[in-house]
Amino acid sequence: MNVIRIYGKDFTFCELLYTFVAIFKKRIPVSMQTIQVKDKSFSLFISEKEILREIKRIAKQINKDFQDKEPVFLAVLNGSFIFAADLLKEVNLPSEISFVKLSAYQGVTTTGKIREVIGLNVDLTDRPVIIVEDIVDTGLTMAHMLDVLKQQNPASIDICTLLLKPGKLQVDLDIKYCCMEIPNDFIVGYGLDYDGYGRNMRDIYTLIKN
């Protein structure tokens, strides 16, 4: 496991992430009914209280399903970092977590095809794997990620997503753990962004359409 030394003290990447999220949340404004992110306005859609309630529900199911197992959680950056931190705090299993990014084929922007998973530092052979994602919409990127991960011969692969847009799915995915299904609206907050902004909001907001 990678260790980072800061002021003479060693930290794992996960420890730094949890610390960062805790500090991040302390500086986040309290819930607001409407927010402005760059040139767009958004209204409150899902409160932090609702989000955390659903995360606890999902974590409880994961604890039950993976009892006596040691799963590997693969949290997909950038969007899932807050979700992953809150989820793992509710998981009481011996487990590992790796924060990964997806590398797309150059010039491909609509097919979702990826060529590799960057940052994976855990051997997945014969290990149960849980992919942690912020949102699944078309499902194309997730489907290709599954193809890439299967080449490492894990014991199993399950998908855990904070949000799912069933009306936008273009592929058949078996999503075992889903906190909430939502309509096909543009949203920000709790890790989700608009042009890089808005990830730091405690709640999830939906675009106000003119």
Model-based region annotation:
Residues 2-9, 13-210:
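PRPP-associated nucleotide enzymes
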